[in-house]
Amino acid sequence: RKDEYGGSLENRMRFMTIVMEEVMKAAGSDIAVFVKMNMRDGFRGGMEIEETLEVARRLESLGVHALVLSGGFVSKAPMYVMRGAMPIRTLTHYMDCWWLKYGVKLAGRVMIPTVPFKEAYFLEDALKFRSEIKIPLIYVGGLVSREKIDEVLNEGFEAVQMARALLNEPGFVNRMRREEKARCNCGHSNYCIGRMYTIEMACHHHLAEELPLCLQKEIEHLENK
């Protein structure tokens, strides 16, 4: 954009600032306002941490109650936020559009490159926010064990968010209360991600239907890499 909403970071924050001023005014003292934001977009030319820290400072100054720290860009860097490999066979299996299915089969691994999974993969960047931002921060990304969650909370984060760990084991939080070494059984095949664009998100451990053999083999391959 070439107008007052594009170009410099200050201009690009203008619309956000206008919106958040109205949101905070409407919320008053009755509603807690959390903002989920990227620390990095995860692709060349996207926002990096120097700029997003400025965004966080602006949100803090606007009176936001907490920030949820994430990253990635679904259309350009989906695995930056999800981590691991995209299960291309699963993704195309559930597609109805024949030409899209064919195109993803041919170029999917180039279009959606793998980003290796590790526990708490956003923690290094999130700690930079923790040292600069005073309002509550909620950590998200790669939490699959009580031990790592305890580590994150001990670093000063007020709360954590989980997704795939709870898809894999809905009672995982209750098990963590009982077991100090609790760890979910998610194998990071990303089957749940592969199907979420066409049907409901679900872990392959909790399906009513039987998986086709080709998808079983893909899951086994990805989980044993």
Model features per residue range: what roles?
Residues 1-225:
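Flavin-dependent oxidoreductase catalytic cores
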